[in-house]
C-alpha cells in the first residue's frame, strides 16, 4: 500500500527495481502504474531468484503483468545490467526502488549508477536501511568480517553517500525505508 500510494502521489510512470526476490513488490508496482494510466518497470535480481517458488515470471503471469515488466536475472549483481542501461542510453526512470544487495559494495555503486538513469525530480527509495547479515548462517555471509556482518550497510550508503550528495534533497525515512529526490540542476 505504501508503494502504491507513493506512485499515485508522485505521478510515477517509469520504475527501476533493484532486487525483486519473488516479484511481489514488482506486481504491486505494476498494479499501481496501471491505476495511474500505465508505465514501465525494469526489475533486476540475481539468477538465484529464478529458482524461487513462485518466481517473478510466475507471479507476473498470474497477475496479468508479464508483458508490462522487463525483468533480468544477473549472475553477480544488478550493477552489471545498469551499466548496460547506461551504455544504451534508451531508458530513464522517475523512481528507483532499491531492495537488493543490502551491502556497501552493491548498494553504494548502485546509488551512483542509478543517478545516471534517474530523471531530475525522480525518487530513490532504499528498503531495509537497518538490515544486517548478523543472523544469517549462509556460507557467503559467514565469510564476511564480523564488522561487515553487524553493520547496517544500506544505512551507511544512505548516511555517507546519498544524504550528503548535492543533487539530492527532500530526504525522509519511514518504516525502514529512506526516500531521496533528485533535484533539477
Model segments located where?
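S-adenosylmethionine/decaboxylated-SAM
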Residues: 1-185
Amino acid at each position: 500500500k505504501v508503494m502504491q500510494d507513493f506512485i499515485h502521489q508522485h505521478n510515477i510512470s517509469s520504475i527501476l527495481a533493484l532486487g525483486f526476490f519473488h516479484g511481489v513488490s514488482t506486481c504491486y508496482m505494476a498494479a499501481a502504474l496501471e491505476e495511474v494510466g500505465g508505465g514501465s518497470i525494469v526489475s533486476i535480481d540475481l539468477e538465484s531468484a529464478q529458482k524461487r517458488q513462485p518466481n517473478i515470471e510466475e507471479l507476473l503471469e498470474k497477475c496479468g503483468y508479464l508483458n508490462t515488466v522487463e525483468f533480468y536475472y544477473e549472475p553477480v549483481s544488478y550493477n552489471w545490467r545498469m551499466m548496460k542501461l547506461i551504455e544504451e542510453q534508451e531508458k530513464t526512470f522517475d523512481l528507483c526502488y532499491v531492495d537488493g544487495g543490502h551491502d556497501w559494495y552493491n548498494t553504494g555503486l548502485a546509488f551512483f549508477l542509478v543517478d545516471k538513469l534517474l530523471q531530475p525530480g525522480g525518487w530513490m527509495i532504499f528498503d531495509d536501511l537497518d538490515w544486517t547479515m548478523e543472523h544469517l548462517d549462509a556460507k557467503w555471509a559467514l565469510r564476511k568480517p564480523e564488522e561487515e556482518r553487524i553493520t547496517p550497510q544500506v544505512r551507511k550508503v544512505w548516511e555517507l553517500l546519498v544524504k550528503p550528495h548535492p543533487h539530492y534533497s527532500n530526504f525522509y525515512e519511514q518504516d525502514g525505508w529512506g526516500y531521496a529526490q533528485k533535484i533539477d540542476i
